């Protein structure tokens, strides 16, 4: 439940509006509320990090509003909490009125939800499940450059899970649609909340089965097999894509060195 910020309140401050994050001096604000002109605003505690509270403040600032991507190099847990704050702020902003009856809604006191004051409908933050998969063929890994990433970064394949589809089916479909190949021996690795805008990445490793690379030009600029010791520019550390690539490289080193 949110409350009014007092002078001595302290912690990490996720100040967000319209999926933007306030980053004075390029950093996530930390310290006493008075230092950031937050006293008197409403705040909701959304977690803790290193024993300090993490607060969400739904507010637009005139300057230094940026993307949560700018704090991706933070500790993984703090980055996740910043992402949670941005997603919750957008959820509360976009769910002021009920989609069924049009009446005003109010936040739940017990969970991340909005409740309709008229028809009692309950809304939760939208989470979009996605798959991301590293595909290995002998001593090489399949890496692609996506159309939305024109900075030279090559990464593994990923995509959204469709309605009525299992995660395993989503992997097979996305890989076939984007690269034209089939995979086998699928293995779950880990997951990562990814607030761009509200994804939950489920990470897998797989082995090449059959087929030649035929890219979907709407999704990819190019895709190729890269030997584990001769890789192109990769996603930054801290991303689940980077972990999948590094895990695949480690497996190749164990077998080929």
Curated annotation (Swiss-Prot):
Binding site for a divalent metal cation 1: 158, 178, 219
UniProt motif (Nudix box) ranges: 159-180
Keywords: Hydrolase, Magnesium, Manganese, Metal-binding, NAD, Zinc
Catalytic function, reaction form: a 5'-end NAD(+)-phospho-ribonucleoside in mRNA + H2O = a 5'-end phospho-adenosine-phospho-ribonucleoside in mRNA + beta-nicotinamide D-ribonucleotide + 2 H(+); NAD(+) + H2O = beta-nicotinamide D-ribonucleotide + AMP + 2 H(+); NADH + H2O = reduced beta-nicotinamide D-ribonucleotide + AMP + 2 H(+)
Signal peptide range in chain numbering: none
Residues that hold a divalent metal cation 2 according to the record: 174
Annotated protein name in UniProt: NAD-capped RNA hydrolase NudC
Lineage: Bacteria, Pseudomonadati, Pseudomonadota, Gammaproteobacteria, Enterobacterales
């Amino acid at each position: 439940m949110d409350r009014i910020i007092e002078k001595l309140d302290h912690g990490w401050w996720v100040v967000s509006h319209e999926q933007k994050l306030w980053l004075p001096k390029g950093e996530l604000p930390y310290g006493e509320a008075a230092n950031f002109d937050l006293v008197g605003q409403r705040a909701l505690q959304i977690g803790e990090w290193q024993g300090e509270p993490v607060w969400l403040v739904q507010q637009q600032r005139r300057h230094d509003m940026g993307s949560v991507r700018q704090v991706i190099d933070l500790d993984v847990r703090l980055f996740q909490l910043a992402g949670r704050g941005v997603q919750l702020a957008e959820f509360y902003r976009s769910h002021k009125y009920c989609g069924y009856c049009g009446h005003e809604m109010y936040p739940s006191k017990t969970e991340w939800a909005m409740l309709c004051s008229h028809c009692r409908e309950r809304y939760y933050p939208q989470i979009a499940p996605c798959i991301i998969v590293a595909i290995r063929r002998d001593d090489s890994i399949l890496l692609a450059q996506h159309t939305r990433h024109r900075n030279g970064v090559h990464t593994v394949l990923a995509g959204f899970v469709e309605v009525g589809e299992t995660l395993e089916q989503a992997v097979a479909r996305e890989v076939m649609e984007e690269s034209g190949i089939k995979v086998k021996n699928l293995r779950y690795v880990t997951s990562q909340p990814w607030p761009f805008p509200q994804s939950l990445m489920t990470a897998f490793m797989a082995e090449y089965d059959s087929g030649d690379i035929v890219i979907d030009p709407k999704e990819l600029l190019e895709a190729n097999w890269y030997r584990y010791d001769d890789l192109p520019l990769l996603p930054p550390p801290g991303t689940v894509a980077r972990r999948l690539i590094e895990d695949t490289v480690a497996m190749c080193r164990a077998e080929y060195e």
